[in-house]
Amino acid sequence: DPTSIHIVAPTGVYRDAYVPSSLREMSDSELADLWMKELMEGIDGTSIRAGFIKLAMSDDGPMPLEIRNLKAAARASQNTGAVIAIHTIGGRVARQEMDVLEEAGLDLSRFIWVHAQTEPDLSVLKEAARRGPYIELDTVGAPFQSQDQLMEAAIALIESGLSDRLLLSHDAGWYNPARADGLPDSGYRGYTALAEDFIPALSARGISEETTHQITVNNPARAFAF
């Protein structure tokens, strides 16, 4: 309330090893029904509705239970319009996800490839973007991430006419239950690097204010609307 910032909570599930026992035996349609309820009615009996579906895939590609999760997410998205954001390491895994989602009938414009900067081949990023999903480059401002790599990936997408498929994120501020202070092992990072450093750097490289507005305002608004 003090900042008027909108906080969007997800429904969904993490990768195979972290799926709770209560969800492991569900069919894809049963899981989709659960997620649709959290999107349209509220989470865990509250009136707080989820605003998107979040999944995670194993680094070597979707495992059988994760394929079930993809099918459930596609069903829930098709019935609600909610976007699906997926923790995805590398272009090969992203292609596998997109194939499963498309086969399940999903319009790939309702899919966000989270952590797309983990794919170093810019041609793979552009190929993926042309299939319709949002390409999210995150860890902006992170000490463990090359900011030059993020910059080159963003510019490659923009110069290829794909700025409407680009999202930028800090991937910061999450709570770590393994530590008493709740901080990630890499330490606390705020939410200022994008506005204070990355966008000015894009401008210095000749990217217009209209384009940066599209990437930071219009694209996320369109992605999360349903």
Language-model region placement:
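Short acidic/histidine-rich active-site segments
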Residues: 138-139, 162-186, 212
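Structural preference for beta-strand elements that scaffold enzyme active sites
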Residues: 6-8, 50-52, 83-85, 110-112, ...
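Alpha-helical scaffolding segments of alpha/beta enzyme cores, especially the outer helices
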Residues: 30-37, 41, 68-79, 96-103, ...
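Divalent metal-binding pocket/active-site signature
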Residues: 42-120
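Active-site glycine- and acidic-residue-rich loops that bind
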Residues: 114-119, 138-156
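Active-site gating/metal-coordination segments in enzymes
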Residues: 1-78, 134, 139-144
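Mid-to-C-terminal alpha-helical segments outside catalytic/metal-binding sites
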Residues: 190-226
